[in-house]
Amino acid sequence: MEGIIRGRVWRFGDNVDTDMIIPGRYLRTFSLDELASHVMEGARPEFASQVRKGDIIVAGRNFGCGSSREQAPVALKHAGVVAIIAESFARIFYRNAINIGLPVIMAKVDADDGDEVSIDLRSGQIRNLTAGSEYRMKPFNDYMLSILEDGGLVNHYLKTIDTGISGDEG
């Protein structure tokens, strides 16, 4: 992974829970396209029809709180979201996102809908290119970057088995 992500912002507030991300009535849906067509329906009904591949969510505190459902980060990723920046995350959402290869970044960033943001996962620099402001985050280490680059934990594990690379490096 090159470590730099750039995209258009969708702004959300605090306490965006998993039921807002993907309402419970869709949890028995196995189609990723169907999940993506309802993503963020509980928070912003227009999101699913307007999100584009490469978009970034910027939110407040406690993003992904509520019930544990892996479908929440899966739906976001399949809809085209390439990263989520929030002041804090629910732990299970954070792990589920990393496990599927969706970068989740803890930082307080001022950005509005439509702003363009760049995130350097290696250096820890976040820039709001529209507003001209810069922020810091804890950089991802090489091991975490390799999980994200491989598309998530399962793919990383399978690649590790295939190549014989130890997961202890980095």
UniProtKB/Swiss-Prot annotation:
Top-level EC class as recorded in UniProt: lyase
Q: Does the keyword S-adenosyl-L-methionine apply?
A: no
Query: What domain of life?
Result: Archaea
Q: Name one Pfam family in it.
A: Aconitase_C
- Cite a single GO BP annotation: coenzyme B biosynthetic process
Keyword terms:
Lyase
Q: Might you give the EC number(s) for this enzyme? A: 4.2.1.114
Q: Give start-end ranges for motif YLRT.
A: 26-29
Pathway, according to UniProt?
Organic acid metabolism; 2-oxosuberate biosynthesis
GO MF assignments: homoaconitate hydratase activity
Annotated CDD domains: IPMI_Swivel (cd01577)
Q: Which InterPro entries match?
A: Aconitase/3IPM_dehydase_swvl, AconitaseA/IPMdHydase_ssu_swvl, Homoaconitase_LeuD_type2, IPMI_Swivel, LeuD, LeuD_type2/HacB/DmdB
Known catalytic reactions: (2R)-homocitrate = (2R,3S)-homoisocitrate; (2R)-homocitrate = cis-homoaconitate + H2O; (2R,3S)-homoisocitrate = cis-homoaconitate + H2O; cis-(homo)2aconitate + H2O = (2R,3S)-iso(homo)2citrate
Show which residues form the site (Critical for substrate specificity).
Answer: 28
Which PANTHER family does the entry mention? Answer: 3-ISOPROPYLMALATE DEHYDRATASE SMALL SUBUNIT 1, 3-ISOPROPYLMALATE DEHYDRATASE SMALL SUBUNIT 2-RELATED-RELATED
Functional summary from the UniProt entry: Component of a hydro-lyase with broad substrate specificity for cis-unsaturated tricarboxylic acids. Catalyzes both the reversible dehydration of (R)-homocitrate ((R)-2-hydroxybutane-1,2,4-tricarboxylate) to produce cis-homoaconitate ((Z)-but-1-ene-1,2,4-tricarboxylate), and its hydration to homoisocitrate ((1R,2S)-1-hydroxybutane-1,2,4-tricarboxylate). Is also able to hydrate the analogous longer chain substrates cis-homo(2)-aconitate, cis-homo(3)-aconitate. These reactions are part of the biosynthesis pathway of coenzyme B.
- Similarity annotation: Belongs to the LeuD family. LeuD type 2 subfamily.
Q: How does it assemble?
A: Heterotetramer of 2 HacA and 2 HacB proteins.
Q: What is this protein called?
A: Methanogen homoaconitase small subunit
